[in-house]
A protein has these predicted regions:
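Active-site-adjacent structural elements in folded domains
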Residues: 39-47, 113-121, 304
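Amphipathic alpha-helical segments of tetratricopeptide repeats
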Residues: 31-35, 88-92
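Beta-strand-rich ligand-recognition modules
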Residues: 292-314, 320-334, 483-515, 519-589
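Beta-strand-rich binding/interaction modules
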Residues: 265-288, 516-518
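Aromatic (Trp/Tyr) and acidic
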Residues: 3-21, 25, 50-89, 108-274
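Flexible glycine/proline-rich, aromatic-decorated loop/lid segments
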Residues: 94-113
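C-terminal beta-rich recognition modules with glycine/proline-rich loops and embedded aromatic residues
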Residues: 26, 157-165, 170, 174-259, ...
């Protein structure tokens, strides 16, 4: 169960009531299996359900905040450290360009993003919702490593990236539906909720997401105001008697204007953020009432430009954000790249065909884009080296951001060039955010390898009636997991379940099935008795050749076809202490 937020809830009750017994409960509800490695700077997150862990860490941080002055409990500093380490490892090692994380709701290996590219169940919106909550908490008592008098800019950099590219992209602009999974698989699409059919977790958090665009634009400390984000807004800073208006068309236009609408007669400091994507100081010129403001602008690392003076009504501060195109490689350094303009992730439409279930129905998997998976060799591949690819993307004229790619693309485009727009504006379409890159020499070999792998995967998917990934929370819940003396784990970055007693699932049979395929390790092939509806499966399986990691597939030709409906499959030891560790259960036509 996703129990992660219980510790934060009790901590909040402690803050509201002033009763420390609730704070003690919050500490007791804090999951040590997650906490202890984080305190020691160890990332043990692979294989864990992502959005169960993030709320736990929010709780660690909240408890640390409320325990600073507790003389009977001296762990506040290390719990705060655990939250910061978690944030750093998820953001820097486990997140893709849009700021999201996880595949099929679970943390995949930090050094292997293959599943992120291949799977249609990409980053979950709830994860990013909670990562932004954690980001806001950590920012408020952070310090820039290069300037202890400023907050740490890394928190704003992430917040901005995730806000524009995942949160803003997670609501369909016409009907208002919310997105659960945002596939990073090139050529796939998102599914949108509907009021009558969908009440997912990402609908609940989605209702909040799109009310909070204003919460991180500004921050204040004593007589200093931080301008963090470039979003049209009005601020009423009651404590200092200041009202301020920010006007901008960012990201379509680089110009930002701050207008003082009301000011007290005293000195105040404006801290204007210089983001890391600004690159260099060329073009980052600030004027106050039309006159150039001279200042030592630090660039190359995100920081703030301080302006201290006695402000008056009508003062105008104007500056331009020097945005440029960049190319960002997927974190595991495979040959997949994303284009960004400043902090804005760009994407291309790959068609509007076969958008099956784009508006969700009320089925258990209605939030998943089940339509045809475009073979990866059919989506745009960029031919050339990364530097030449970056220089082949050109900004088009016009009021809205749009770009044209005039480099070498395979397959050749129907139009003369590939067109890209901000991902948050691309809806009701298949899309590509990440593009495979290859040199001229690599291209032919890669195409052949991708085509072979895709053909095999497509053939298997087309034959699949039902599929379970044992050890993963959602697939097991969907198939009514039951067990006795059983455990889960991971091996070679794959989830498994095994038992000293037994474990069972309810297979969902949507059409007649004639074969059962079980994935185990080679050394585990004869360790389990399999029962279908309490009847022992006695046929001998055909055994596939072991793959490079030692996994094999046992394929059983069923003596009788399974009819439409449901069927219990149960595993128990076959004269051994444990059953096989089962990695995949697949029912085939």
């Amino acid at each position: 169960s996703e129990h992660g937020g219980l510790n934060e809830t009790f901590a909040d009750v402690a803050a509201i009531t002033g009763d420390k017994k609730y704070l003690e409960l919050a500490r007791r509800f804090s999951h040590k299996i997650i906490l202890d490695p984080l305190i020691k700077d160890k990332d043990r997150l692979t294989g864990m359900h992502a959005n169960t862990q993030i709320p736990k860490v929010i709780g660690y941080k909240r408890i640390a905040e409320l325990s600073q002055d507790d003389k009977n409990w001296n762990h506040a500093e290390e719990w705060d450290h655990a939250a910061r380490f978690f944030w750093n490892t998820v953001v820097n090692n486990r997140s893709v360009c849009i700021g999201g994380n996880s595949v099929r709701e679970h943390f995949h290996p930090a050094d292997n993003f293959t599943s992120m590219i291949n799977d249609v169940q990409g980053p979950e919106t709830c994860n990013t919702y909670n990562m932004l909550r954690l980001t806001k908490m950590l920012y408020q008592n952070s310090h820039n490593p290069c300037n202890i008098n400023e907050p740490d800019p890394s928190y704003i950099n992430y917040y901005e990236r995730a806000l524009y590219n995942h949160i803003l992209a997670s609501q369909e602009p016409d009907k208002g539906g919310f997105v659960y999974f945002t596939p990073m698989r090139p050529g796939h699409y998102r599914v949108y909720s509907q009021p009558e059919t969908s009440m997912w977790c990402c609908v609940g958090s989605g209702l909040e997401n799109h009310t909070k665009y204003g919460e991180f634009i500004y921050a204040h400390q004593k007589d200093t105001l931080y301008v963090n984000l470039f979003i049209p807004s009005q601020l009423n800073w009651k404590e200092q008697g200041v009202t301020l208006t920010q006007e901008t068309l960012f990201p379509d236009d680089e110009k930002v204007t701050l207008r003082i609408d009301k000011a007290a007669k005293k000195n105040l400091t404006l801290m204007i953020r210089i983001p890391e994507w600004a690159g260099n100081s060329e073009g980052y010129e600030i004027t106050i009432n039309g006159k150039k403001h001279l200042s030592d602008i630090q660039t190359g690392a995100s920081t703030y430009l301080p302006i201290r003076r006695k402000w008056k009504k009508g003062d105008m501060i104007t500056f331009h954000l020097p945005m440029k195109v960049s190319l960002e490689q997927i974190p595991d350094k495979k040959d997949y790249y994303a284009f960004l303009y400043g902090p804005i992730v760009l994407a291309t439409s790959t068609g509007t065909e076969n958008l099956d279930g784009i508006y969700a129905d009320d089925s258990r998997g209605g939030h998943i884009a089940h339509g045809r998976q475009t073979p990866l060799q059919e989506v745009p591949m960029l031919i050339g080296n990364p530097d030449s690819i970056r220089h082949s993307l050109h900004k088009l004229s016009g009021s809205k951001l749009a770009f044209s790619y005039d480099g070498n693309v395979y397959p050749a485009q129907k139009s003369k060039s590939l067109e890209l727009i901000p991902f948050f504006r691309l809806h009701n379409s298949r899309y590509a955010v990440y593009f495979r890159q290859a040199s001229e020499e690599q291209f032919k070999t890669i195409q052949e390898e991708m085509a072979t792998a895709e053909r095999k995967a497509t053939e298997l998917a087309n034959r699949t009636v039902d599929l379970i990934f044992p050890g993963e929370q959602q697939p097991e819940s969907d198939h009514s997991i039951q067990y006795e003396a059983s455990e889960t784990g991971t091996h070679k970055d794959r989830h498994f379940r095994r038992a000293k007693g037994w474990f069972s699932y309810n297979l969902k049979i949507k059409e007649e099935a004639s074969q059962l395929m079980i994935t185990v390790r080679q050394e585990d092939r004869n360790k389990a008795v399999i029962l279908l509806n309490n009847e022992k499966l006695t046929v001998h399986p055909t055994v596939s050749k072991a793959d490079k990691d030692g996994f094999i597939r046992l394929c059983y030709l069923l003596p009788r076809k399974l009819k439409v409906g449901s069927c219990e499959i149960l595993f128990k030891p076959d004269g051994t202490e444990w059953t096989s560790a089962v990695y995949e259960v697949r029912l085939l036509k």
